[in-house]
C-alpha cells in the first residue's frame, strides 16, 4: 500500500444532498463522519482542515440534516453525515435519518471508512453502537473519536479510552479508539494518519493503472 500524506487544509466544500439518492457519482474514495447531534462533528472537521467555517457549527443540535461532502483532493472526499439522536427532532424525521444512514453505510461502494464521534463524557449510547454495528457488518473500518477530551483530566481521559476499547471488543471489527480535542489539538494527527491510510487505496490504483 502506498504511503501518502494529504494536506487536509486544502479541503473545500463540494455539495450537499438531502439523502443518499442525491449524492454525486459513487466513485473515488469517501470517508464518512457520523455522530450524535452534540458530539462536536463540525468542530472536529474544522480542526482537521484548519478552517473555522468549513463545516458549519450550530448552537442548535440537529441543524445539519443534509449530507455534506467536502473534497480533500480529486477523488478523495469527506462526508459529513446528519447528526443523529437529537430529542427535539420529530420522531418521523429521526427514523428517516437513521434509515438513510444505514442505507449509506451498507450500499455506498466508494465508502472506505467511518469516523464515529462521541462526547468522551457520554460514549457508546444506543445509536452510537448501532452505527458501529452497521459499519462492521458492512466490513468497513471504524475510527471512534472521543471528542471534547479537554473536558477531562488526563487520567480520566485514559481511563475512558481504555473502557471504550474494552466495551467495543464484542463488535469484532476493525475499530480503533482515540481521544480527540479540537481545542487542545489532541488526536488531530492520529485522525489525519488514519484518513491517509484509508485514502491511500486511490493512489495505489492510480499507480497500478
UniProtKB/Swiss-Prot annotation:
Pfam families: MMR_HSR1. Keywords: Cell cycle, Cell division, GTP-binding, Magnesium, Metal-binding, Nucleotide-binding, Septation. The keyword Metal-binding applies. This is Probable GTP-binding protein EngB. Its cofactor is Mg(2+). Mg(2+) binds at residues 42, 64. GO terms for molecular function: GTP binding; metal ion binding. HAMAP family: GTPase_EngB. Belongs to the TRAFAC class TrmE-Era-EngA-EngB-Septin-like GTPase superfamily. EngB GTPase family. GO terms for biological process: division septum assembly. One of its GO terms (cellular component) is cytosol. CDD domains: YihA_EngB. InterPro entries: G_ENGB_dom, GTP-bd, GTP-bd_ribosome_bio_YsxC, P-loop_NTPase. The gene is engB. It comes from the Bacteria. Necessary for normal cell division and for the maintenance of normal septation. GTP binds at residues 35-42, 62-66, 80-83, 147-150, 180-182. Residues 27-201 form the EngB-type G domain. The keyword GTP-binding applies.
Amino acid at each position: 500500500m502506498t504511503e501518502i500524506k494529504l494536506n487536509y487544509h486544502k479541503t473545500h466544500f463540494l455539495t450537499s444532498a438531502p439523502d443518499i439518492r442525491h449524492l454525486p457519482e459513487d466513485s473515488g474514495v469517501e470517508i464518512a463522519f457520523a455522530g450524535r447531534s452534540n458530539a462536536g462533528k463540525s468542530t472536529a472537521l474544522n480542526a482537521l482542515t484548519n478552517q473555522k467555517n468549513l463545516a458549519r457549527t450550530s448552537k442548535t443540535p440537529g441543524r445539519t440534516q443534509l449530507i455534506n461532502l467536502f473534497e480533500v483532493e480529486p477523488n478523495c472526499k469527506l462526508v459529513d453525515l446528519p447528526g443523529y439522536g437529537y430529542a427535539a427532532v420529530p420522531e418521523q424525521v429521526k427514523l428517516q435519518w437513521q434509515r438513510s444512514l444505514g442505507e449509506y453505510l451498507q450500499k455506498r461502494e466508494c465508502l472506505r471508512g467511518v469516523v464515529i464521534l462521541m462526547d468522551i463524557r457520554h460514549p457508546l449510547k444506543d445509536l452510537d453502537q448501532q452505527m458501529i454495528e452497521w459499519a462492521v457488518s458492512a466490513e468497513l473500518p471504524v475510527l471512534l473519536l472521543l471528542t471534547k477530551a479537554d473536558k477531562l483530566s488526563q487520567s480520566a481521559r485514559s481511563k475512558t479510552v481504555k473502557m471504550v476499547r474494552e466495551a467495543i471488543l464484542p463488535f469484532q471489527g476493525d475499530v480503533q479508539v482515540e481521544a480527540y480535542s479540537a481545542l487542545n489539538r489532541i488526536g488531530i494527527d492520529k485522525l489525519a494518519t488514519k484518513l491517509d491510510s484509508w485514502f491511500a487505496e486511490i493512489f495505489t490504483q492510480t499507480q497500478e493503472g
